[in-house]
Regions:
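Residues at secondary-structure transition points
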Residues: 6, 104-108, 133-136
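Non-catalytic nucleic-acid substrate-recognition regions in nucleic-acid-modifying enzymes
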Residues: 1-35
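Glycine-rich, flexible loop segments associated with nucleotide phosphate handling
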Residues: 29-39, 128-131
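Residue-identity detector for glycine
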Residues: 18, 29, 70, 80, ...
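Conserved SAM/SAH cofactor-binding pocket of Class I
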Residues: 112-143
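Polar/charged alpha-helical tracts
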Residues: 9-13, 17, 64-65, 119-123
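Short, polar/charged, Gly/Pro-enriched helix-capping and turn/loop motifs at alpha-helix termini
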Residues: 25, 29, 84, 124-127
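Conserved AdoMet
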Residues: 2, 36-37, 41-120
Length: 143
């Protein structure tokens, strides 16, 4: 590990450059992926903060431990590992779900599927329908 020191703003620029040069981190079929936003999400997650906090304190210097974690996560993310797996958690319909390499990470289109199902059930006046969620991954849809 180098003894390089970074402020939050400097590390975000460093990570953004990495994301701009690599393509493995991109999700196929999703066209609005921003290297800057990806860097912000990654650093916020690594520091267990939110993006607003990063923007409020751009001059704050990363500690050695924070830098080590951020760099390790950046290397894994650049190789295509989803941020949710780095964090061990993914939010689905405002529910924080634990995820591992053994589970499928719920996607935005899965949330849309739930929305459509709820709309259809309302149209059909189904107040307590029987629904089977079998073999769909993390079980997020059933929740």
């Amino acid at each position: 590990m180098s003894s390089k020191r970074y402020t939050l703003a400097q590390w975000l620029e460093h990570a953004e450059a990495g994301f701009s040069q690599q393509t493995q981190w991109r999700v196929p079929g999703v066209h609005d992926q921003s290297p800057r936003l990806e860097a912000q999400w990654l650093l916020a997650a690594a520091l267990e903060k939110n993006i607003a906090w990063l923007m409020t304190w751009p001059e704050r210097e990363l500690t050695a431990a924070q830098l080590q974690r951020a760099e390790a996560w950046l290397a894994r993310r650049l190789c295509g590992e989803p941020l949710a797996l780095l964090r061990g958690e993914h939010e689905f319909w405002s529910l924080p779900l634990s995820v591992t390499a053994d589970t499928l990470v719920p996607r935005a289109d899965s949330e849309r599927l739930v929305e459509v199902a709820l709309e259809r059930m309302a149209q059909m006046n189904l107040s307590a329908p029987a629904i089977l969620d079998l073999g769909t991954g993390s079980g997020a849809i059933a929740l």
